[in-house]
Amino acid sequence: MTVLHSVDFFPSGNASVAIEPRLPQADFPEHHHDFHEIVIVEHGTGIHVFNGQPYTITGGTVCFVRDHDRHLYEHTDNLCLTNVLYRSPDRFQFLAGLNQLLPQEQDGQYPSHWRVNYSVLQQVRQLVAQMEQQEGENDLPSTASREILFMQLLLLLRKSSLQENLENSASRLNLLLAWLEDHFADEVNWDAVADQFSLSLRTLHRQLKQQTGLTPQRYLNRLRLMKARHLLRHSEASVTDIAYRCGFSDSNHFSTLFRREFNWSPRDIRQGRDGFLQ
């Protein structure tokens, strides 16, 4: 597995924060780092396989990656990211106690993926741009300023994350997208889902299309197909069983949609013909 080293990304040995844009982020094999990072998805879509678990990411997704996590990107479509790198929560010169603002593992579950709405994403961009402007400065005031901006970024993300901000339709759409990640195999009635998240059906269609480039049903189908592809690669369940487990009632229809999405049949993926190395 590829290991990314801090010496290749941080501007100096004493820099506590670095900015690494990926505009766009192409498919990238599984790797880990000797540093931590906050991945901010600007726009586009892709699959983020995090510690073996696939997540669909779109504009507004924020992912917190620790130095022992492994992850990869695949099936990217105009996916643009900004990575905010930091050496460790306890490696700041002027900040202490940052762990309290970061996601915490509970009962073996690590809430790595958060979502923020578009207006918050704009504020995030402004903070990141200010950090970028000061990257070449190594004096103490500049270091302190960058670390303060990093603290502001964490506070903004924490206050504005999906769990704490449901005041507008954009935030409710983010909640809906997170719900789909957990209920992709369920039979989805879009009228009922819109009501569940206090959105009109028209608003749901418009905002989901703006955020992902896909209609609601197309997004759900892609999500199901991504989960199915992951199971084909990493489980021994039959193609038919995987189709049913991922929300498809007809395995033939599943195979047709799968080939249309990936240009490979489910059996091709199972046999590794697409060249994916497990």
UniProtKB/Swiss-Prot annotation:
It is found in: Cytoplasm. GO terms for cellular component: cytoplasm. Its main location: cytoplasm. InterPro entries: AraC-bd (IPR003313), AraC_XylS_family_regulators (IPR050204), Homeodomain-like_sf (IPR009057), HTH-like (IPR037923), HTH_AraC (IPR018060), HTH_AraC-typ_CS (IPR018062), RhaR_RhaS-like_N (IPR047220), RmlC-like_jellyroll (IPR014710). GO terms for molecular function: DNA-binding transcription factor activity; sequence-specific DNA binding. Residues 191-212, 239-262 bind DNA. Residues 174-272 form the HTH araC/xylS-type domain. The record marks D241, D250 as: Interaction with sigma-70. Keywords: Activator, Cytoplasm, DNA-binding, Repeat, Rhamnose metabolism, Transcription, Transcription regulation. GO terms for biological process: positive regulation of DNA-templated transcription; rhamnose metabolic process. Binds DNA as a dimer. NCBIfam families: PRK13503.1. This is HTH-type transcriptional activator RhaS. It comes from Escherichia coli O6:H1 (strain CFT073 / ATCC 700928 / UPEC).
